[in-house]
Amino acid sequence: MFHKGATAVTASAFSGYFVAVQREGIFHYSLEQGWRKLFRLKSKIHCISYIGPYLFGVGEKGTVIRSADEGKTWTMSSFPTNATVWAITGRNNGFVCAHGKHCIYVSDDFGVSWRVAKPFAEFHNPPVIRSLCLHGGNLFIGTQIHEYFGGIWAYDIKRDTVQVVKKEKNRMTASMLVFNENWLVAAMGSVKGKHGAVTVRNLLNGEEFTIQSSMIRNEESFLDLSEDDGIIYVTTTQDENGFSRIYQVDLEARSLKWFDTIKGHGWRVANQKENFFCAGLYECKFVQPYEVSAMIH
């Protein structure tokens, strides 16, 4: 049943991975125990993330799920939005933020209560939010493609002010992470033409560089980033043959190293050092690059 594909994954704090399987629910996968079904759920979950001791999942039509016991039991609620929620992030002190179409949902008690922040309230035609990345007092907001307000914004949560970090007219910002405290790494995607890229920006001096595929081909879109122990992986959308790729990002060499291929879009990736799990549109793949690859059906 696991050739059906998955929509989200995160590495467990103990072992294995939590995986959102399309239209079926939340599972745990580990090499030792294989697959275990934890929570039956028809809603699509697009992001699973640890915030403090809790596991959160968010997805279509504002769905929010939360577990306090490593996925054994879950509570389910929803934000007042029909939008797909692609990202949830937070800190160990109880601060959590997720997004609606144009707004941010903020909690100070690990998601027990929420308030709404509107970083784009002054904009006549605001961009649709696609990704979030929390760093210090700033919440970086990545948008879907928007001619005027597309790109990456820095929202100061305390001051309720927003400023542009990077303008993007023709690309979405699908995923972001901060590496080594100073580098904002973003997975960018285009709709027409192969203009996908991984962009890297120094938050101290504004220096920026772009990494594109080192293979002969250019990618239309990069989708998801994951980092563990200094090792970064990035996924792509599927190509004309229906396959996408998983690359390792080498910031020093400013290059992408091709590691594996998966059928359909590579929706999400999570890694534990070099080993990674990719949640793809049609299949899931757990890869130990320096051992024999395991396809999961």
Curated annotation (Swiss-Prot):
It comes from the Bacteria. InterPro entries: WD40/YVTN_repeat-like_dom_sf (IPR015943). Gene3D superfamilies: YVTN repeat-like/Quinoprotein amine dehydrogenase. This is Uncharacterized protein YkuO. It comes from Bacillus subtilis (strain 168). The gene is ykuO.
